[in-house]
Amino acid sequence: METLELQGAKLRYHQVGQGPVLIFIPGANGTGDIFLPLAEQLKDHFTVVAVDRRDYGESELTEPLPDSASNPDSDYRVKRDAQDIAELAKSLSDEPVYILGSSSGSIVAMHVLKDYPEVVKKIAFHEPPINTFLPDSTYWKDKNDDIVHQILTEGLEKGMKTFGETLNIAPIDAKMMSQPADTEEGRIEQYKRTMFWSEFEIRQYTHSDITLDDFTKYSDKITLLNGTDSRGSFPQDVNFYINKETSIPIVDIPGGHLGYIQKPEGFADVLLNMWG
């Protein structure tokens, strides 16, 4: 893996291929390796970069998180993630780059576009679970508070079951999300990663400071992506609302919420039709 030294962290990332830079931002998994099957399909067209977000996978903190980062209303980590992606983009290319964020990674991508639009050539938001600008935002914020409370008091299994039911996660995705790692060490790491995400992201990222105006300013750069196998899920409803209010196009893409793993060939074909 490649390394970029940043304030407070060593950011590590996979890089394959040639051509214009395309950065993938992972969601709850936090690690870029989930994009490697997709990267193989795109490496003849793009320099594909798949990031381990700060404090996930091989990326490591060189300074501790501030105590406030676990506050449900803290934007520290999502803003720091966005800054990391912008600095990575500038280190890799003198030109604006392509960016795709999935799930909570798409929320990071929104903050990249809002705060660092100069680094973005084109950007895609794949099934973002953000609620800030929705008419029923308070309802969803309360639901996420309840889910985190359940995880912390009743355990990860019960809390994640409620999470899946509340967001109407498709069966194809629920099965993959609940699949344990192959080794004991992997299962321990998986548990730690999910608990970290629960405490520091479920509430903070989904209710972070993004408005519809942040999209309309740069609507010519944005594509919304909804999976063909995750119809009816909350993240898809978010994209439908953005589309209704801004007319930013939605493109159907193969697979579910984890479509880049489930159907990488078809996922890549859609990206190449969009950007190739």
Swiss-Prot record:
Residues 57-76 are annotated as: Disordered. The keyword Hydrolase applies. This is Uncharacterized hydrolase MW2501. Transmembrane segments: none annotated. GO terms for cellular component: membrane. It comes from the Bacteria. The lineage of its organism: Bacteria, Bacillati, Bacillota, Bacilli, Bacillales. It comes from Staphylococcus aureus (strain MW2). Keywords: Hydrolase. Residues 20-137 form the AB hydrolase-1 domain.
